[in-house]
């Protein structure tokens, strides 16, 4: 018996079968020795486990981990995991990782993997010289890297010693090929994305309606005048702008709102509307046309802010600067627009040309800006007696007194919820000859500049009685409205005034209780009281219940007023 046979002579057939997972027990010593020699010959390439180890091929463990456990344990009910098994598996994995790291193709694999990461995450920004950031991680640059790698390998060929491992070499080559394909796919995806973006931009430029942009640029082509170079209106006998006329005061070129405030809407002293109204009083217009040049120094003699020449009854002419105001629905550039339409002194202001003014507001709300532009929007009335050659009525630029009356009547009838529904907007637009957009803009401005000052004034006065308005609370269903429609034909709009002192007399409709404002603690000295329906409820929770009031005299109860 040889030396190898003596080594395994003391071990029985059962012990060898248990350790190696062999199910047969009639094995002799020679067969055991031959099988063990086969295991040793499998790892003679220098990368496997050392001779004498009982582990099998490490590549098979990855595909079938159970084979590794069955190699050391029996198929019976014994535990399938022991510390020795984990130690052996960790050692084998460590040797496999070291063999991969020491492979000559590993630096090329790392370089290609980094290129794929850069191609995925790097933005494709074009620099000034025309090169993009993707040139570093492009597929074409990999050829240069490959040539550099081959040159470096050939230079260091005599310094490196490598034992061939066909299985590991095949894995490395397949990994490099897979990453190479992935890099090509990433480059193709970026190319398709860039092509799509370019075609999309070209399509937008071809189909985008640029006529509106061109109109805005044409309207704002005049150079803006600095506010410091403008003073009061001077007297000049020349109708041109080149005369010695002193420019009048010019407000800021952009103002998003054009509805007059209730505080200065009724001023008749001739002072110009300052602040955000962007309009001038027309009370001293005739006096400015007929008076001498000394009257132009007074602030009350400012005429209408309109371009062109104003002719007086005495024959004297004065040159007006072209003043235009940008509204939210007109031009967004906020520039100046020069109009040359003369406005006669004998012409009533109700029949003034709409093209010569953009923002006009008279004391008492006789006129108000529509919020329309020269873009050809038509009103809701498709045909009318005053229609143009196209059969459609031209949208007026200035609100008439009747339109203002209807709007104000509806607003003060529905102060608790000043949001008209779509049907009511259509009805108001049909009655006034305006567009729905103009009606909507008027109510937006009115809620901010008429209703909100009333609320602020009541809050400053320390009383919250009649003015309890639902602020910023829209209906879920726009078809319903808490107030009546102005199509009833009532002339009650003339009785309404934005003055809060006369509001109680002019608004007889009771207001509903705003329970949503009473969710937490009472405010403004309002005493808390318990809910009779739920006496044990925390007073800090839920809604409060109003005290008993005569139902015939007042249907709704306002909880914002102090109670005894």
From Swiss-Prot:
It is found in: Nucleus. It comes from Caenorhabditis elegans. Disruption phenotype: Worms exhibit severe posterior disorganization during embryogenesis (Nob phenotype). Mutants exhibit Q cell migration defects, affecting cell position along the anterior posterior axis. RNAi mediated knockdown abolishes nuclear localization of ceh-60. RNAi mediated knockdown targeted to the intestine represses expression of vitellogenin genes; further repressed on ceh-60 mutant background. PANTHER family: HOMEOBOX PROTEIN TRANSCRIPTION FACTORS. Residues 40-59, 216-270, 293-313, 328-397, 455-503 are annotated as: Disordered. This is Homeobox protein unc-62. Residues 133-218 form the MEIS N-terminal domain. Belongs to the TALE/MEIS homeobox family. Disulfide bonds: none annotated. Acts redundantly with ceh-20 and ceh-40 to perform overlapping roles during embryogenesis. Required for postembryonic development of the ectoderm, including the Q, V and P cell lineages, playing a crucial role in ensuring that these cells and their descendants undergo their invariant patterns of cell division, migration, fusion and morphogenesis. Has a role in the mig-13 pathway to promote anterior migration of neuroblasts in the Q lineage. Required for multiple roles in regulating vulva development. Transmembrane segments: none annotated. Residues 328-344, 381-390, 455-469, 494-503 have a biased composition (Polar residues). GO terms for biological process: animal organ morphogenesis; brain development; embryonic pattern specification; eye development; lipid homeostasis; mesodermal cell fate specification; muscle cell differentiation; neuron fate specification. Forms a heterodimer with homeobox ceh-60. Residues 392-454 bind DNA.
């Amino acid at each position: 018996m040889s030396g190898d046979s003596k080594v395994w002579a003391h071990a029985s057939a059962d012990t060898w079968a248990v350790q190696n997972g062999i199910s047969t027990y009639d094995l002799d010593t020679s067969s055991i020795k031959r099988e063990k020699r086969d295991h040793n010959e499998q790892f003679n390439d220098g990368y496997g486990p050392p001779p004498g180890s009982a582990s099998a091929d490490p590549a098979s463990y990855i595909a079938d981990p159970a084979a590794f456990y069955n190699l050391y344990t029996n198929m019976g009910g014994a535990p399938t995991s022991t510390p020795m098994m984990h130690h052996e598996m960790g050692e084998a994995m460590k040797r496999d990782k070291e063999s991969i790291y020491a492979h000559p193709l590993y630096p090329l694999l790392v370089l290609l993997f980094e290129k794929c990461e850069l191609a995925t995450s790097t933005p494709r920004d074009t620099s000034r010289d025309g090169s993009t950031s993707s040139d570093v991680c492009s597929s074409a640059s990999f050829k240069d890297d490959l040539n550099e790698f081959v040159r470096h390998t050939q230079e260091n060929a005599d310094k490196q010693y490598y034992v061939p491992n066909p299985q590991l070499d095949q894995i490395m080559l397949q990994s490099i090929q897979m990453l190479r394909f992935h890099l090509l796919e990433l480059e193709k995806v970026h190319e398709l994305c860039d092509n799509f973006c370019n075609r999309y931009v070209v399509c937008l430029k071809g189909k985008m309606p640029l006529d509106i942009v061109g109109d805005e640029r044409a309207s704002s082509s005049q150079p803006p005048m600095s506010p410091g170079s403008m003073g009061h209106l001077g007297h000049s006998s020349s109708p041109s702008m080149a005369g010695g006329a002193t420019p009048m005061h010019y407000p800021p070129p952009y103002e998003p709102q054009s509805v007059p405030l209730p505080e200065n809407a009724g001023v008749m002293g001739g002072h110009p509307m300052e602040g955000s109204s962007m309009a001038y009083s027309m009370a001293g217009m005739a006096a400015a046309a007929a008076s001498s040049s000394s009257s132009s120094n007074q602030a009350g003699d400012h005429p209408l802010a309109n371009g062109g020449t104003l002719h007086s009854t005495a024959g004297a002419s004065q040159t007006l600067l072209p003043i235009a105001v940008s509204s939210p629905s007109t031009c967004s550039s906020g520039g100046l627009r020069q109009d040359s339409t003369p406005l006669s002194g004998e012409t009533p202001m109700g029949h003034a040309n709409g093209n010569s003014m953009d923002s006009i507001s008279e004391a008492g709300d006789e006129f108000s800006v529509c919020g329309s532009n020269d873009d050809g929007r038509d009103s809701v009335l498709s045909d009318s007696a005053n229609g143009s050659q196209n059969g459609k009525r031209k949208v007026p630029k200035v609100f008439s007194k009747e339109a203002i009356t209807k709007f104000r009547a509806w607003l003060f009838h529905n102060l608790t919820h000043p949001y008209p529904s779509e049907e009511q907007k259509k009805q108001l637009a049909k009655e006034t000859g305006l567009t729905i957009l103009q009606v909507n803009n008027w109510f937006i401005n009115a809620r901010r500049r008429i209703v909100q000052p009333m609320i602020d004034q009541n809050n400053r006065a320390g009383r919250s009685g009649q003015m309890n308005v639902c602020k910023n609370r829209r209906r879920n269903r726009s078809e319903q409205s808490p107030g009546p429609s102005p199509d009833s034909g009532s002339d009650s709009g003339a009785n309404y005034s934005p003055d809060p002192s006369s509001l109680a007399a002019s608004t007889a409709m009771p207001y509903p209780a705003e329970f949503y404002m009473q969710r937490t603690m009472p405010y403004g000295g309002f005493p808390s009281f318990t809910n009779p329906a739920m006496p044990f409820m925390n007073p800090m929770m839920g809604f409060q219940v109003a005290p008993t009031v005569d139902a015939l005299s007042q249907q709704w109860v306002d909880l914002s007023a102090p109670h005894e």
